[in-house]
Amino acid sequence: MPNLKAIRDQIQSVKNTKKITEAMRLVAAAKVRRAQEQVLCTRPFADALAQVLYNLQGRLAFSDVNLPLLAQREVKTVALLVVTGDRGLCGGYNTNVIRRAEQRMNELKEQGINYQLVVAGRKAAQYFERRNAPIAAKFINLEQIPTADEAGTIGDELLSLFLSETVDRVELIYTRFISLISATPVIQTLLPLTTQGLAVQDDEIFRLVTKEGKFKVQREKMASQPAQVFPQDMIFEQNPVQILDSLLPLYLNNQLLRALQESAASELAARMTAMSNASENASELIGTLSRTYNKARQAAITQELLEVVAGANAL
C-alpha cells in the first residue's frame, strides 16, 4: 500500500515548485514586452542606416576607394560570434544556438578553414570551454536588456581581430526574434560589412493580455517599409568617402546591438513558454498524485473496516 505521508509530501513539493515556475513565468512575461518593444524600435534605424550605406556604396561603386571594413580577402580564418544567455530554464533556446554553431564549425572544418570563437553568454562559454574550443574572447554577465555600450565593447574586439587580419571574416550566430512562439537561430556575416537590409515581413507587434488567469497574445502583422533610393543629383556637404568611413563602425555596432536585443527577447519568450509548460505539467502531476492519495486513503479506510468486522465476527 502506498505511503500516505510520502504522497502528501510529494504533493506539497510539487505545489512549491509550481509557485516558483509561476513566479518565473510572470517575471519573464513582464520583461518580454519591454524587450520586444526595443527590438522593433531598433529595426527602423538599422534598416535606414543600411539604406544610407547602400546608396553611398552605389555612389562610390566606380571610385578607387579603400575602406578596410569593406575589404574582401581570401578567407583562411573565420571568427564566429555566438550569442546565448547566461542562465538556463528557457527551453531549447541555448541548445539550439550552440547546435547551430557546431554545425557551422563542422562546415568550416570540412572546407579547410580555421575558426575562432567569440562567445557572448555564460552558457556558450561554459559549453565550448569544456570542449577545448579555440575561444578568442568571451563576454558574460551581460544585461538582460542589452545596451549600446555592451555592443560597442564586443564590436571593438571584432574590429581588432578583423583589422589586424587575425581573421578574414566575422560571422554572427544568434536567435532571430519573430514572435513569442517563433525564434530561429540564424547566421549573419558581420565583417566585411554588407548592407542587405533587414527582413521584417514576418514580424508581429503583440501585446500580452490575461484571460481567466492565463496569458493570451493579441497579434498584429508588421508591414515592411519600401527601400528609399537617393536621387543621383544629391549633393553631400562632406566627401561621401568620409561619411561612409564614419558610418561603418556605427553600422557594425548597431547590427550587434540589434542581435543582442533579439537574442534577449527570444530568451525571455522561451523562458516564459518553458515556465508556462512547467506550471501546466505541475498542475497535472498534482492532480494525478491527489487521485493516488485519495485511492490509497480509501483503501486504508476499507482495510480498517474489514479488520474491525473480522474482529467482531471472531468474538
UniProtKB/Swiss-Prot annotation:
Primary localization: membrane
GO molecular function: ATP binding; proton-transporting ATP synthase activity, rotational mechanism
Pfam families noted in UniProt: ATP-synt (PF00231)
Membrane topology: Peripheral membrane protein
Keywords: ATP synthesis, CF(1), Hydrogen ion transport, Ion transport, Membrane, Thylakoid, Transport
InterPro entries, alphabetized: ATP_synth_F1_ATPase_gsu, ATP_synth_F1_gsu, ATP_synth_F1_gsu_CS
Location(s) in or outside the cell: Cellular thylakoid membrane
GO cellular component, one term: plasma membrane-derived thylakoid membrane
Highest taxon of source: Bacteria
Chain's role: Produces ATP from ADP in the presence of a proton gradient across the membrane. The gamma chain is believed to be important in regulating ATPase activity and the flow of protons through the CF(0) complex.
Family: Belongs to the ATPase gamma chain family.
Subunit note: F-type ATPases have 2 components, CF(1) - the catalytic core - and CF(0) - the membrane proton channel. CF(1) has five subunits: alpha(3), beta(3), gamma(1), delta(1), epsilon(1). CF(0) has three main subunits: a, b and c.
Protein name per the record: ATP synthase gamma chain
Taxonomy of the source species: Bacteria, Bacillati, Cyanobacteriota, Cyanophyceae, Oscillatoriophycideae
